[in-house]
A protein has these predicted regions:
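Soluble acyl-CoA-dependent acyltransferase catalytic core bearing the H(X)4D motif
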Residues: 1-215
Length: 215
């Protein structure tokens, strides 16, 4: 267990760190309020814009059980790069769009495709080339375009969604990003555990390109 400060100097130092931390967190409130307002307003004007708690109800979002299934699929990276270059996006965005297509086809096969697009929670590195310290990760919400039949149009919607999330985070401090993520994701986590607020769904699936263990 963590030991308590043993001297007045240690106590003063701990209180100073606590005060600095609280001040830094409090300073994020205006920025968070501004971003939440912007998100809510833009969502009213753009049907493809990803707002908070707009993920639709799907057959995927049920009580978690012990049943598990693993499937793997390989694709040529060179082909993905050609597509990414043609559409002016990243390979990761192409993969997100492919996942959107796969989910759309699966939902259609189950007669369960919602009218609204599925939303993915995507871990994203926020590190700058000159930044110090450990990992800096943010969680963005991406529109997977599952309501769109045309693959090219779907890719454009996914790309726009990812870019908007990146631009939003680029204008925020690390503390604001952390608190914004917590504010938008925490209610969803609570709902997953309790099922008390089924409408508080920020995302339907998690899609990540974080490498797994090499062995």
């Amino acid at each position: 267990s963590r030991s308590l400060p043993s001297s007045p100097v240690d106590v003063a130092s701990s209180l100073a760190r606590l005060g600095a931390g609280l001040s830094k967190q409090a300073a994020t409130v205006p920025g968070l309020a501004r971003e939440i307002y912007k998100v809510s307003q833009k969502a009213k004007k753009d049907e493809n814009y990803v707002s908070i708690f707009q993920a639709p109800d799907t057959v995927l979002n049920q009580t978690v059980t012990g049943s598990r299934r693993f499937a793997a699929q390989s694709y040529s990276l060179s082909r993905l790069k050609v597509i990414a270059k043609a559409f002016g996006c990243t390979v990761n965005t192409v993969v997100l769009s492919m996942c959107g297509h796969a989910l759309r086809e699966y939902m259609i096969s189950q007669n369960a495709l919602p009218d609204e697009p599925l939303i993915a929670m995507v871990p994203m590195s926020l590190r700058q080339d000159d930044s110090a310290g450990g990992n800096q990760i943010g969680m963005i919400l991406a529109n997977l375009g599952t309501h769109i039949c045309d693959p090219a149009n779907r890719l454009r919607v996914v790309h726009d969604s990812v870019q908007e999330a990146k631009e939003r985070f680029s204008q925020m401090s690390p503390e604001e990003i952390l608190n914004f993520t917590a504010l938008t994701m925490a209610p969803t986590g609570l709902n997953l555990l309790t099922g008390l607020a089924p409408k508080w769904r920020a995302f339907n699936v998690v899609i990540s390109n974080v490498p797994g263990p090499k062995e």
